């Protein structure tokens, strides 16, 4: 009876002799080297937002909100502007009330429009065409669609009918990394074939209006946005555009069952529609567990938190970001992209971390061998992480 022996080598950057080693090869019982499954690389990213942008003051004015406490929540959110699709005004210049059916229609329309734009931008960045796409995974939590968004986009854009697809629905703000994990596995099993994760969140289609502080917090936070990220494992026609992306090395998750009700998007019988609930303790719950999941992510890699050059964290809100910074010992500079996305877009849910990733790429400062951590958090309560290397 033979035993497989694992040998560790750095295949991506063999020139970095002092770099921690993360790639694993396997020897068979006969001592022959078995091929190592190719690791997926991020080869493109693209984002999109809806056409209209509002300051927090403009949103307050649009709905005639005068309550001092509610106004304070909006104006002290560290958010300057958000892209939103507000309801039309009636003959008296008052915003009309939207039914749940209206909101579902809005979600479908905006998700397709933003999703298509983000997908095109992503493919353009990596020098690919729609005809190159072999797997499309769509993520959304701001509406429910059957058939899923992937099927609707395939029809809308004329994508090959043989393109495989998947939809991740209802997982919330963490779902972009859940999807990246799944699609990274697909990419490794299909070397040379292009896959895309597309997050499309029409947060303007997931709101309610009342006088509670709970609703005020939610309505002050979210914005419309879509983000797409392309993955490719092994050979596949790499170009200068695709070489800027990192290799995906590892994922780690942490769900906090005792806080399962702390973040919810469920049916509000009083309002007759779906609505968000965000517990005020969320920042502290996330902060208290951030260190645990990051340490698990780095376990066995030889890396310490101080070795991570780039942190791309979900723009979950001012207090959530502060809690992550404090508990991981980061600086405001470390999360500058996250802070900037929150300031300019608000919380765009599952695709927020990809907006931050796009900003990092635009800086042009990443260097071969550097490591990055991607982090999202959402209902469950859940923290998702990924380790990448340029």
From Swiss-Prot:
Keywords: Antibiotic biosynthesis, Transferase. The keyword Membrane does not apply. The active site is at residue 173. GO terms for biological process: polyketide biosynthetic process; vancomycin biosynthetic process. It comes from the Bacteria. Transmembrane segments: none annotated. Its EC number is 2.3.1.246. It is an enzyme of class 2 (transferase). Signal peptide: none annotated. It catalyses: 4 malonyl-CoA + 4 H(+) = (3,5-dihydroxyphenyl)acetyl-CoA + 4 CO2 + 3 CoA + H2O. Pathway: Antibiotic biosynthesis; vancomycin biosynthesis. Belongs to the thiolase-like superfamily. Chalcone/stilbene synthases family. Involved in the biosynthesis of the nonproteinogenic amino acid monomer (S)-3,5-dihydroxyphenylglycine (Dpg) responsible of the production of vancomycin and teicoplanin antibiotics. Catalyzes the Claisen condensation of four molecules of malonyl-CoA to yield 3,5-dihydroxyphenylacetyl-CoA (DPA-CoA) and three free coenzyme A (CoA). DpgA requires the presence of the dehydratases DpgB and DpgD to facilitate the aromatization of the DPA-S-DgpA or DPA-S-CoA intermediate. This is 3,5-dihydroxyphenylacetyl-CoA synthase. It comes from Streptomyces toyocaensis.
